[in-house]
Amino acid sequence: EVNDNQPEFTEEELTTVSYEDYSELDELGRCQLAEACIGQDLMPTEARESISSVKPTGWKNKSYDTVDGGYVYNRCHLIGFQLTGENANEENLITGTRYMNVEGMLPFEDEVAAYIKETDNHVMYRVTPFLRGMTWLPQEYRCRQSQ
């Protein structure tokens, strides 16, 4: 657990007005912090389009028959498409393993989306990729939310 499983938003940051903000890419072209106050008004009403035009740092596209889904690496949204409808935004797409994307991030995003749909409340949401040195891929992702 990070911070005893307590959200790290200050009182000044908390709001019920929907917004989304994506930091500029760093000097190596890597994603930085992504933050949003997510309400139903930000959630997509149409299906996701292709994101294949975005090549995040560290991107490798090789399929393997022995890997579930075929690919070791996925293009991963920092803030999932189902939450804000952001599609091929290079400031919101990182290279991550399929496992991290499907088993790590997706269940958390599903839980947040279900909560918003069921309650019509807003959720403060922040994702920070931690990059060490000149590496292309984050070694850690920290996702925080507050209802």
Q: Language-model segments: which ranges?
A:
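Surface-exposed, interaction-prone regions used to assemble/regulate multi-protein complexes
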Residues: 1-10
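Domain-level detector of nuclease and nuclease-like folds
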Residues: 9-147
